[in-house]
Regions:
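Extracytoplasmic
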Residues: 15-49, 239-245, 362-367
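Cytoplasmic membrane-interface "Motif A"-like loop-to-helix N-cap segments
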Residues: 76-87, 282-296
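Juxtamembrane intracellular "pre-TM" segments in multi-pass secondary transporters
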Residues: 3-9, 193-226
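Cytoplasmic helix-loop-helix junction between adjacent transmembrane helices
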Residues: 103, 109-148
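Helix-loop-helix hairpin linking two adjacent transmembrane segments in secondary transporters
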Residues: 143-192
Length: 405
């Protein structure tokens, strides 16, 4: 771990955290833009449903696989240097995507964006742990998460309006400029104080960090947790961030702005959901029953959305999913209750990595299902959503069947 830093004033700490939160806002925007970008990209670049799914998944794949590297960087180099070195890749990826003329270039842009955004939330949590009192960690982290959700508001109606009046290239261009402004703000505003004199310094090697993560799999309940983490968050972001827009446009002939309005409503419904579940859910290991129950409820909701082809019903189901989406944060409470303090940090890192690699897996597999569906006389969106529902049930079953913490 990095040595403890000298204390910051409350005003200075909040000012720096707000600047860092802007990178997190943009990471949320980039991970959810496929729902609105999907239809124009499909039309202009002749993308198949499978290619669209793979493109959206590329962000989450890059984001997920870079979590260990970013965690090590934070320990060795600190918050400021980690985000300043990584985030230019987001700017470059967005700029490259705005000029893409082929699927391959679009994929490279998406991989760069995902890599650059990888430390966006980690730097916030590490900064909070270093510069806020321990009792403030959860409420301040929750505030940052709520701020971050505004990124998905940007990629709802505002992005749809911009694309409808210009093109999808302008969407990437505006996000690239926003990322550049954010980088400059962080460069100007975020300056962590030097470590206190005499503070011990321990810097883990990459191999030691990987060994520590792999050691968690010797605990029998880790497998169930990872199986669940791979599918829970993935279902929400795959619908909100990938299939919602194309489904509404193709099934019901919604305009891009109309589908953006639905995405906006779904996002607004989800903003207060984590805080709600944090208040009503039981503490400790009782969370396990809640996690399994909510996964089953959401899987049934997704299956209903797949089979009921009525516009108002699909819109209502999407908003209901937003209201229920906060159940996923209960995984963090489960980790806190199940793992000893000595390995809790690594367990949380593993959970985060599994969540984002799961999004990549979910989007790729649902894209494959959508691509194969017409050959069997099945609507692509029906196949994609039923596949997602089945994967969520499988993850919940593994979580129930394997030993608990």
């Amino acid at each position: 771990m990095s040595p403890p830093a000298a204390p910051l004033s409350t005003r200075a700490a909040w000012g720096m955290l707000l600047a860092l939160s802007c990178a997190f806002i943009l990471s949320q925007a980039f991970r959810s833009l496929a729902a609105i970008m999907g239809p124009p990209l499909t039309q202009d670049l002749q993308l198949s449903a499978q290619e669209l799914g793979n493109w959206s998944a590329a962000y989450h794949f890059a984001f997920g696989v870079m979590q260990v590297a970013m965690g090590i960087s934070l320990d060795v180099w600190g918050v400021r240097r980690t985000i300043l070195l990584a985030f230019p890749l987001t700017i470059a990826g967005a700029a490259l995507s705005s000029q893409a003329g082929s699927y391959g270039v679009l994929m490279w842009g998406q991989l760069l964006i995902g890599t650059g955004c990888a430390p966006a939330f980690l730097v916030c949590t590490v900064f909070i742990s270093r510069h806020f009192a321990p009792a403030r960690f959860t409420p301040v982290s929750g505030t940052v998460m709520s701020i971050g959700y505004s990124g998905m508001l940007l990629t709802a109606t505002p992005l749809a309006w911009l694309i409808a009046r210009t093109s999808w290239r302008w969407g990437f261009g505006v996000l690239a400029v926003a990322a550049l402004v954010t980088w400059l703000w962080i460069f100007w505003r975020v300056h962590e104080p030097a470590p206190e004199p005499g503070a011990p310094t321990r810097r883990p090697s990459p191999m030691a960090a990987l060994t520590g993560l792999m050691a968690l799999f010797r605990l029998p309940y880790t497998r169930g947790l990872v199986a669940y983490a791979l599918v829970a968050y993935a279902t929400y972001i795959t619908i909100r961030g990938l299939w919602l827009g194309p489904l509404l446009v193709d099934r019901f002939d919604f305009s891009l702005v109309q589908s953006g309005n639905v995405a906006l409503a779904m996002t607004l419904a989800s903003i207060g959901s984590p805080a709600l579940f944090g208040r009503i859910a039981p503490a400790g290991r009782g969370l396990r029953r809640w996690l399994i129950l909510m996964a089953v409820v959401v899987a049934l909701l997704i299956a209903t959305m797949a089979l009921v082809r009525v516009a108002w019903a699909d819109v209502l189901l999407a908003v209901c999913f937003g209201l229920l989406s906060g159940y996923m944060v209960l995984q963090y409470g489960y980790v806190h209750a199940s793992y000893p303090a000595a390995v809790r940090g690594r367990a949380l890192s593993l959970l985060t990595m599994a969540m984002f690699l799961g999004v990549s897996l979910m989007q790729s597999v649902s894209g494959i299902a959508a691509g194969l569906a017409p050959g069997f006389g099945v609507e692509p969106f029906t196949a994609a959503l039923l596949t997602m529902s089945a994967l969520l049930l499988a993850g919940a079953f593994a979580f129930w069947k394997w030993p608990q913490g």
